[in-house]
Amino acid sequence: MAGKTRVLLDRPTRRAAILRAAARAFAERGFAATSMDDVAAAAGITRLIVYRHFDSKDALYAAVLQDVRDRLAESSAAFAGRGESVAVRALLAVGREDAAGVTLLLRHAAREPQFASYADEFREQVITYADRLMRLAHAPARVRSRWAAETLVSFVFDALMHWLEDGDPDLDDAFLARVDASLPALVTAWAGVS
């Protein structure tokens, strides 16, 4: 009778695998309903191995959120200079490789009091970016408001989450083109209203 072959991973690779498995488990069950045993099962390892990398469930959840934010920053830098929708392209790229992690950051973390700062800080960065883009596009001053920037960000986040859930990855370029066309159209429509 042959047993399972044990796969030894180096520490960074194991940590990354745990983070991805934890993101899936937390996104599926929520923070409160997910145990470290659930994370271990999702990662195909023992709870002891999870604890070798993370002291607590809180530390693990925070690490998942920070990892997603770090990868979004790296992806944004990689897409820099490729048009105005750098943030959307970065969100989609990371979302395609880790939909659960992006879901935690954009949807779940804001509702978890001990983790809301991760979502709030990220959202604030994107709102500031949206406001800067409106200024660069010479949007009228009456349009450039906190409300407008927040509305654009809400539109992008919701559109992205729905696309990740229901959209065909082969049509990602079409999705990006629609978002690229929609954002200026919204700002232009707002500018036309007195």
Where are these regions (language model features)?
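Basic, helix-initiating cap at the start of DNA-binding domains
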Residues: 1-29, 33-44, 58-62
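N-terminal intrinsically disordered/low-complexity leader segments
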Residues: 1-13, 134, 138, 143, ...
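Amphipathic alpha-helical segments that line or abut small-molecule/effector binding pockets
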Residues: 20, 81-100, 146, 150, ...
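Short hydrophobic/aromatic patch on the recognition helix
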Residues: 44-54
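Alpha-helical DNA-contacting segments of helix-turn-helix folds
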Residues: 58-68, 118-122, 126
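Amphipathic alpha-helical segments used for helix-helix packing
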Residues: 94-117, 131, 158-165
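Amphipathic alpha-helical packing segments from all-alpha helical-bundle domains
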Residues: 113-138, 143-154, 174-177, 181-188
